[in-house]
UniProtKB/Swiss-Prot annotation:
UniProt protein name: Bargin
Keyword vocabulary terms for this entry: Cell membrane, Cytoplasm, GTPase activation, Membrane, Phosphoprotein
Keyword hit for Membrane: yes
Membrane protein topology class: Peripheral membrane protein
UniProt GO BP: negative regulation of small GTPase mediated signal transduction; positive regulation of GTPase activity; regulation of actin cytoskeleton organization; regulation of Rac protein signal transduction; signal transduction
Region spans: Disordered: 1-39, 168-190, 504-577
Described purpose of this protein according to its UniProt entry: GTPase activating protein (GAP) which specifically converts GTP-bound RAC1 and CDC42 in their inactive GDP-bound form.
Modified residues (Phosphoserine): S183, S270, S272, S552, S558
Entry-linked SUPFAM superfamilies: BAR/IMD domain-like (SSF103657), GTPase activation domain, GAP (SSF48350), HAD-like (SSF56784)
UniProt-listed Gene3D superfamilies: Arfaptin homology (AH) domain/BAR domain, HAD superfamily/HAD-like, Rho GTPase activation protein
Example of a GO MF term: linear polyubiquitin binding
Residue ranges, compositional bias (Pro residues): 516-530
Region (Mediates non-covalent binding of poly-ubiquitin chains): 574-677
Amino acid sequence: MDRGLPGPATPAVTPQPPARPQDDEEAAAPHAAAGPDGQLGTVEQRLEPAKRAAHNIHKRLQACLQGQSGADMDKRVKKLPLMALSTTMAESFKELDPDSSMGKALEMSCAIQNQLARILAEFEMTLERDVLQPLSRLSEEELPAILKHKKSLQKLVSDWNTLKSRLSQATKNSGSSQGLGGSPGSHSHTTMANKVETLKEEEEELKRKVEQCRDEYLADLYHFVTKEDSYANYFIRLLEIQADYHRRSLSSLDTALAELRENHGQADHSPSMTATHFPRVYGVSLATHLQELGREIALPIEACVMMLLSEGMKEEGLFRLAAGASVLKRLKQTMASDPHSLEEFCSDPHAVAGALKSYLRELPEPLMTFDLYDDWMRAASLKEPGARLQALQEVCSRLPPENLSNLRYLMKFLARLAEEQEVNKMTPSNIAIVLGPNLLWPPEKEGDQAQLDAASVSSIQVVGVVEALIQSADTLFPGDINFNVSGLFSAVTLQDTVSDRLASEELPSTAVPTPATTPAPAPAPAPAPAPALASAATKERTESEVPPRPASPKVTRSPPETAAPVEDMARRSTGSLAAAVETASGRQALVVGKPSPYMFECITENFSIDPARTLMVGDRLETDILFGHRCGMTTVLTLTGVSRLEEAQAYLAAGQHDLVPHYYVESIADLTEGLED
């Protein structure tokens, strides 16, 4: 045998097992696990742009907010530039003549800026709730969670591919070792085989994690697809909120502009104004109003009742104390133009009560009808209670259906109001005195010289009819009643929602201020304040705690003259038809409450007040009483809500001296010249 140089070694060929189907699956697994293909792949490409869009739009929308983000209504309104503008206007028009064109325009502008600020605050709060918060969750929570799953899947797939490469290399090394002559039982072969087994187990575990993560990621993508339409609705909702905000703002501005132009005698030819049509509410017949709006209960009746149930049932002197003229006028205009924006008036129950009285008073025909006037009077004249009740029931049955429904609704409410008489001081008799002349009055007869005297007699009978209706409401109008008939107003529970903040307050002992220009005489002991006085004083303190509303200022005239004390202090019960009066000393009077326009005229024309002072709605100040007979004695004057002759007559006829003591005048006519019809 020749011994030469060794030839090249022939590598041992290790037989490879035939390819298995699962090997093909594993080869394709990294690609399949890397992410979805097809339609879901397209969805996957939309994730990052959607996240960026939600984030950027949320950021820009947040920058559009003018109020304090996340704050409640009151705090937000105070921070708005519009409210700062309204406050500046309110401070400015106090220095102007309120009867001047600029003063009137500035006062109305102040009120409208206040209203626009509240509309803006409501818009921003709705925007935060319905758009900003959902966009924040989408960009900061929902989409980042999906993208996090995607990133986790990519990392797992990368780790899996690395491990598969190591396993493949280890398998090759194990085969090479066996081909080079390593015996199956050798230490190196055993070590290599163990390594391969370990890598296979790790690869199987990692493969399971990849599949689990991929399933979760695909589920996230499917969830995103199903919710894409709801995400799009965020932007639709944004436009809806903006449209509602601009509509409400435009309605408020149109109403204010119409009033301003009317006051300035300028006819408005603006297309936007002439094209706007508001349903008729005040001054139109009940049947026409109900037909135009498709309602069962008149809008002012239901709206005012719902607001009073919410905030006013325990308000002392409700329906008796008058609201500010500007507030009442704005409430009536809002009732016709935008009844969904009445929330701001809930905190002023006297304005709400005034709006209800005004609606009943402005009906072309009284709610209890002209046709049945004589029948009501005959029923009231019956002395026997049972016969009177039966007669009233018979007259009620003859009312037109729409009148009966609204009268039943109103009487049920007034009966509930009377249940709180211990707090609100409004007994069925007091309620009837105030509201009776607004529910029924005789038909006008031209040329009837005796109508004034007849009105005084009929007022007494009307009060008796209405008082009986209130006292017997459950008998005359059986069954429970749902005051939220239309479903347009928030349901209220009287025991839970009626505020009793005024019921627990008392008039402070320091309530009577003394002007710096007039030395105050030593007052004689006076009786306790009348209910109306306490109510007005407590209301003034309460209103100082809520956001201020522009009042109706009246600049007064000459300064008062200091008068000598009255010699006869025994004379008592002096006052006006529209005032509760108590005698004190000197010739000074304390004016408390919210005067009606008529009482404003009486005060500004007949009172002498320091010209440095400005008479505002709700102010209290000392002055001389100079209208009627100059009684020459001190009085404490509390203005009430009497604004019609019939109401004044009803006060006197009922002998309600706690409400309206007699005034020393020649006749009722002495005080009726300025009364509004």
